[in-house]
Amino acid sequence: MAAKIRREDEVIVLAGKDKGKRGKVSRVLPTGKLIVEGINLIKKHQKPNPQMGVTGGIVEKEAPIQASNVAIFNSATGKADRVGFRFEDGKKVRFFKSNSELVK
């Protein structure tokens, strides 16, 4: 099955502590979760590891967010949108349901 949200897509958060924020998908996990830049930040207490050149301290990093809590952002309408699939010239392409434009 083709993925409705893919890497490099701009998404908007629909639910949770970061509701309303936008970000770019940096990674799609096989568990149905996404890692979005600047969204769902957590503080991780990092141990120093001189062999790997890692300094210790408190590090902020992005945690995975459930894919059902985000929607793809349609820049033409300025709102969250749904994605559909159709065939054009023998290729399967994604399009926005609200205005039928192709997802870039």
From Swiss-Prot:
Top-rank lineage group of the source organism: Bacteria
Pfam families reported for this sequence: KOW, ribosomal_L24
Keywords (A to Z) from UniProt: Ribonucleoprotein, Ribosomal protein, RNA-binding, rRNA-binding
GO BP terms: translation
Keyword field contains Nucleotide-binding: no
One term of GO molecular function: structural constituent of ribosome
An example Gene Ontology CC term for this record: ribosome
Chain coiled-coil ranges: none
Function: One of two assembly initiator proteins, it binds directly to the 5'-end of the 23S rRNA, where it nucleates assembly of the 50S subunit.
Subunit note: Part of the 50S ribosomal subunit.
Family as reported in the entry's similarity comment: Belongs to the universal ribosomal protein uL24 family.
Name recorded for this polypeptide: Large ribosomal subunit protein uL24
Organism: Shewanella loihica (strain ATCC BAA-1088 / PV-4)
Gene (UniProt): rplX
